């Protein structure tokens, strides 16, 4: 079990135990929303260790309100501007130029999320959902992308090549192959700051949907389903800009090298992280992670060669018009 799993479990036996639990409880586990509850589905190396940004448990809990129901505390947003990417068919969301709060207040997150600071970004576009098996297969068919390291998922022996899962997020793709796909599609990986703004909006929400803890309609997390779900399955969990699946489902690669906000040469205007390093960053948490670990400010430092069954990505590109 790799280091991100250690953040969740603390033991190398966690994966095997989860598989046993899931196998015994398949009939009783929570299911993803039905097709009528879903928004439309949009179609646009060597395994190494992965470590969380902090191995120790957080010293305090974030200021999160307990949900009285599973409904979001704000209306589901309707994106003001969208477009379809010509190369991969992804629906993309316009994120306007402006400031947002990045990171966490002391006592509300983990140490590498401090200090919370104001960042200004130029306008950009970002995929509404994670890149799917269907989309990634088109890049492989063009001879540009490598196939995922494995064709399975956490509980499914056949996943990547199974027509049943075409519109589920591609997994077992390392940072290099994620970037290769985005370039093939005429895009790039989002910066860490771009990803966080798209996830939490300008007000610094704890989660994409607001400041209440997730419920079963917000996200795929904490083994409620036990594996990936179809992209776009949780419209109640949309961010203020309409981005979906930015909490749970699969972690997502971003462009930056990992660095502490307090020690790295971190700009407050269009930051891009350190100039070099040993680890890249993944964001968003996954279907395995607890509510605390799918917060929009949570950071994971990951070897760029790493690939796993709960790690995917989405793409972005800079806007010409601001």
Question: Where are the predicted features?
Answer:
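N-terminal secretory signal peptides that target proteins for export/translocation
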Residues: 1-12
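Bacterial N-terminal signal peptides
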Residues: 16-27
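Ser/Thr-rich, Proline-interspersed low-complexity disordered segments
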Residues: 29-82
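Short, solvent-exposed beta-strand edge segments and adjacent coil->beta transition regions
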Residues: 34, 116, 121-123, 165-167, ...
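A short glycine-rich, aromatic-capped structural motif
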Residues: 85-151, 173-176, 248
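Functional-site microenvironments in short loops/helix caps that host divalent-cation chemistry
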Residues: 101, 105-106, 153-300, 307
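Extracellular, beta-strand-rich glycan-interacting domains
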Residues: 132, 247, 255, 316-318
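Short, structured beta-strand segments at or near domain termini in extracellular proteins/domains
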Residues: 308-322
């Amino acid at each position: 079990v790799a280091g991100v799993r250690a953040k969740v479990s603390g033991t190398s036996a966690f994966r095997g135990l989860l598989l046993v639990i899931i196998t015994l409880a398949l009939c009783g586990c929570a299911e993803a929303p039905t097709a009528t509850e879903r928004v439309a589905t949009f179609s646009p190396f060597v395994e190494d260790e992965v470590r969380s940004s902090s191995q120790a448990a957080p010293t305090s809990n974030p200021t999160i309100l307990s949900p009285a129901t599973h409904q979001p505390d704000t209306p589901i947003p309707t994106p003001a501007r969208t477009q379809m990417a010509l190369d991969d068919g992804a629906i993309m969301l316009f994120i306007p130029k402006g400031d947002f709060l990045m990171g966490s207040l002391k006592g509300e997150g983990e140490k590498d999320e401090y200090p919370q600071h104001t960042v200004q970004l130029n306008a950009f576009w970002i995929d509404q959902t994670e890149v799917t098996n269907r989309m990634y297969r088109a890049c492989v068919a063009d001879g540009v992308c490598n196939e995922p390291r494995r064709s399975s998922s956490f509980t499914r022996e056949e996943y990547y090549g199974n027509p049943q899962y075409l519109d589920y997020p591609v997994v077992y793709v390392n940072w290099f192959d994620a970037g290769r796909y985005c370039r093939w599609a005429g895009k790039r990986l989002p910066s860490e700051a771009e990803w966080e703004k798209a996830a939490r909006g300008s007000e610094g929400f704890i989660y994409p949907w607001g400041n209440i803890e997730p419920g079963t309609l917000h996200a795929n997390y904490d083994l409620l389903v036990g594996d990936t779900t179809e992209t776009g399955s949780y419209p109640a969990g949309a961010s203020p800009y309409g981005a979906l699946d930015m909490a749970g489902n699969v972690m997502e690669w971003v462009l930056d090298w990992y660095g502490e906000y307090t020690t790295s040469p971190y700009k407050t205007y269009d930051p891009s992280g350190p100039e070099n390093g040993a680890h890249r960053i993944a964001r968003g948490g996954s279907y395995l992670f607890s509510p605390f670990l799918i917060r929009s400010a949570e950071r994971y430092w990951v070897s760029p060669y790493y690939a796993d069954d709960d790690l995917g990505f989405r793409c972005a590109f800079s806007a010409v018009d601001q």
